[in-house]
């Protein structure tokens, strides 16, 4: 008989084992929670110094008694500069709308850099004119002082720093004085006639529709090449399909310069990177081209022995002979005038023609003024052109609406004080930047009722001078560093508009074009601008 098999009841042990497994599982879970908590604490310890570094300066203006426009942690007050999703004009507009009328200025941050945003036009006038000695430099000039590799940009008075800008401005400006432009007026008169002939040929071939951006830059390239270097650029004589070197290089040069201005602002979070990366506003290729063009033009003029022609090239020769100006000095002066006369004048002409096409009543009123002054003549002399008051008003109103340079940024060069109110003032330290938002002034209904309407009559009876004196209207800036090319630009715009409107009616297409802001600074017409030009005969 087999012995009975021994059996043991494990159920109590299983019960304890299950509990033990549960306890072990809970222990693991608890350890995970502890590790996660430690990781979060460590992350906070790592992030906190970064956060404090990015935000500790946000009290900068509050400590100094200036109201602060709340900045974002990393992006500052103008996030579009880094994200590239909005235009600087729109970022400034939000702050301007919130604080204008309440404060003369507010504190802002360009990424991490503190800056003063002017909201009161009278304060803008103080910075640009009455207290200019404390704000001599611009943001770009403070950089170019060290960028010795960008030699021609450094020779432009617009970007020059310290005391050099005054000498450069004096030498460059003497060649575009009112008396000198009067003597050289035939260049613009002949250029206007060539423009009319070119347009007549083009409208016949293209069913009256012309891409106006190209048209405007062809004209400014022609008159600037003739005036500065004494050459025919061929922009109004060669077929459109043939490439033109002067216009091609001028467009490449100015496009690069304005792109670098945008990039320059975007890198303000790390200013040292500009010098490390050797930022330059003028590309090497165009530097070489315009250097050779200046050299060859001087050689041709000397070889021809023509000392009677009054233009900018003859002025450059005088600087070389009388002031021992170097070749680089001459190229720098030539490019200074080219920048004013080619790109900014071409863009201003484009917008003026579009606004006239959009406002036929204004266009007709201007045409009547032009034709009445011409009487039986087919052209206007310099004095008659200068006497056209409504033409000048049209140009000013176009410049107000387009605001090609929407803001000016000045740098404090001497310690000074800004009066914020009757009882409060702000000490401004050397190196502090101050932005003047002239686009916002130009589009403020407090100063310009119906600001988006095109009304040249706003500038009737010399209102232009009064608005400038109050710091409200600043298309050319103001003060000692006001754009020196104003007479040149006005002559170029007036001559072109007179020749176009005395021979063509400008008509807008079906769709209205709206100036847009890309990721840069301005709010201007983008892409092709196709307008209809209907020829009529007087």
Swiss-Prot record:
Keyword Cytoplasm included in the entry's annotation: no
GO MF entry, a single one: heme binding
Cellular component terms per the entry's GO annotation: endoplasmic reticulum membrane
Membrane topology term: Peripheral membrane protein
InterPro entries in the record: Cyt_P450, Cyt_P450_CS, Cyt_P450_E_grp-I, Cyt_P450_sf, Insect_CytP450_Detox
Pfam families (alphabetical): p450
Similarity comment: Belongs to the cytochrome P450 family.
Protein name: Probable cytochrome P450 309a2
Phylogenetic lineage: Eukaryota, Metazoa, Ecdysozoa, Arthropoda, Hexapoda
Chain's gene name: Cyp309a2
């Amino acid at each position: 008989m087999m012995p009975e098999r021994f059996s043991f009841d494990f159920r109590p042990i299983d019960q304890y084992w299950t509990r033990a497994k549960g306890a072990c599982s809970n222990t693991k879970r608890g350890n995970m929670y502890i590790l996660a908590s430690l990781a979060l604490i460590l992350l906070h310890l790592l992030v906190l110094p970064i956060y404090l570094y990015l935000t500790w300066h946000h009290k900068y203006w509050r400590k100094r008694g200036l109201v602060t426009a709340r900045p974002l942690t990393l992006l500052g007050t103008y996030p579009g500069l880094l994200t590239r999703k909005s235009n600087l004009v729109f970022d400034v507009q939000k702050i301007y709308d919130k604080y204008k009328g309440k404060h003369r200025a507010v504190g802002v941050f360009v990424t991490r850099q503190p800056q003063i945003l002017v909201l009161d036009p009278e304060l803008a006038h103080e910075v640009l004119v009455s207290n200019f000695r404390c704000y001599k430099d611009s943001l770009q000039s403070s950089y170019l002082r060290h960028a010795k590799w960008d030699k021609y940009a450094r020779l432009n008075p617009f970007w020059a720093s310290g005391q050099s800008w005054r000498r450069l401005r004096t030498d460059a400006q003497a060649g575009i004085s009112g008396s000198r432009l009067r003597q050289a007026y035939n260049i613009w008169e002949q250029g206007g006639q060539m423009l009319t002939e070119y347009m007549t040929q083009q409208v016949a071939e293209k069913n009256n529709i012309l891409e106006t951006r190209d048209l405007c830059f062809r004209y400014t390239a022609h008159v600037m090449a003739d005036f500065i270097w004494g050459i025919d650029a061929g922009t109004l004589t060669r077929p459109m399909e043939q490439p033109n070197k002067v216009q091609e290089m001028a467009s490449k040069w100015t496009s690069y310069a304005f792109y670098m201005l945008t990039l320059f602002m975007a890198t303000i979070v790390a200013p040292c990177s500009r010098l490390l990366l050797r930022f330059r506003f003028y590309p090497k290729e165009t530097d070489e081209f315009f250097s050779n063009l200046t050299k060859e033009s001087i050689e041709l003029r000397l070889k021809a022995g023509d000392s009677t022609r009054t233009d900018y090239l003859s002025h450059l020769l005088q600087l070389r002979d009388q002031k021992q100006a170097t070749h680089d000095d001459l190229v720098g002066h030539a490019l200074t005038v080219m920048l004013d006369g080619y790109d900014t004048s071409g863009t201003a002409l484009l917008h003026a023609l579009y606004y006239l096409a959009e406002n036929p009543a204004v266009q007709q009123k201007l045409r009547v003024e032009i034709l009445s002054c011409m009487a039986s003549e087919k052209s206007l002399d310099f004095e008659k052109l200068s006497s056209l008051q409504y033409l000048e008003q049209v140009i000013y109103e176009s410049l107000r609406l387009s605001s090609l340079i929407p803001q000016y940024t000045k740098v404090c060069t001497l310690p000074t004080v800004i009066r914020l109110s009757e009882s409060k003032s702000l000490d401004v330290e050397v190196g502090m930047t101050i932005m003047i938002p002239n686009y916002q002034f130009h589009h403020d209904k407090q100063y310009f009722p119906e600001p988006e309407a095109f009304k040249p009559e706003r500038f009737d009876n010399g209102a232009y001078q009064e608005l400038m004196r109050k710091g409200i209207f600043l298309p050319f800036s103001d003060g000692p560093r006001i754009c020196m090319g104003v007479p040149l630009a006005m002559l170029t715009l007036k001559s072109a508009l007179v020749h176009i409107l005395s021979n063509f009616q400008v008509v807008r297409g079906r769709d209205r074009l709206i100036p847009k802001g890309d990721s840069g600074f301005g709010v201007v017409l983008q892409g092709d601008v196709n307008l209809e030009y209907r020829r009529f005969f007087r």
